[in-house]
């Protein structure tokens, strides 16, 4: 009889622990619309060209440094964008891939995860030789969330200006979202 009581209590405690762990590992779903405007200057660049079927292609690896402005601290502050572009100089069309790294100013009080910051992978298309439209997918920290958003930018010489999740330069909607959790 005593042995059955011990097994019952052990099973009950084990069940409470299991339920507690399950509740702790799955945060409630959350979403937040976000946006950021940014400008950056090219600090490093390497290009090469090749010709194929009468078209000249320019392949460029570049690093851009600047600032991002956002009401969301994880997207604002110092910004480093690294890109690889392949541009058909004959037609002005091409594609790009790269990374976005933003970090809030040092004056921001670090939370549990440190200073608010975000990292994302970028990919998209180039139109008219200097207009970029693409997608940013990544994560933000302090607090943690996933990042998914549309990106639009214009390159003028060694400067890039654009927006992540804003209504311009392309209307009506160029959304970005921070999200986490599940049901």
Predicted regions and their residues:
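Bacterial N-terminal signal peptides that target proteins for export
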Residues: 2-10
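Bacterial N-terminal signal peptides
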Residues: 10-19
């Amino acid at each position: 009889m005593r042995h059955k009581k011990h097994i019952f209590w052990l099973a009950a405690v084990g069940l409470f622990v299991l339920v507690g762990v399950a509740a702790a590992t799955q945060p409630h779903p959350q979403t937040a619309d976000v946006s950021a405007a940014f400008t950056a200057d090219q600090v490093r660049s390497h290009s090469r060209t090749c010709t194929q079927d009468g078209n000249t292609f320019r392949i460029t690896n570049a690093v851009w440094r600047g600032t991002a402005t956002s009401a969301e601290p994880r997207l604002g502050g110092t910004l480093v964008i690294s890109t690889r572009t392949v541009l058909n100089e004959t037609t002005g069309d091409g594609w790009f891939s790269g990374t976005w790294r933003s970090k809030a100013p040092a004056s921001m009080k670090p939370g549990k995860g440190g200073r608010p910051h975000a990292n994302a992978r970028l990919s998209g298309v180039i139109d008219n030789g200097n207009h970029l439209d693409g997608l940013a997918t990544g994560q933000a920290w302090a607090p943690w969330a996933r990042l998914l958003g549309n990106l639009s930018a214009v390159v003028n010489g060694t400067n890039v200006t654009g927006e992540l999740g804003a209504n311009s330069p392309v209307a009506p909607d160029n959304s970005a979202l921070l999200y986490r959790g599940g049901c």
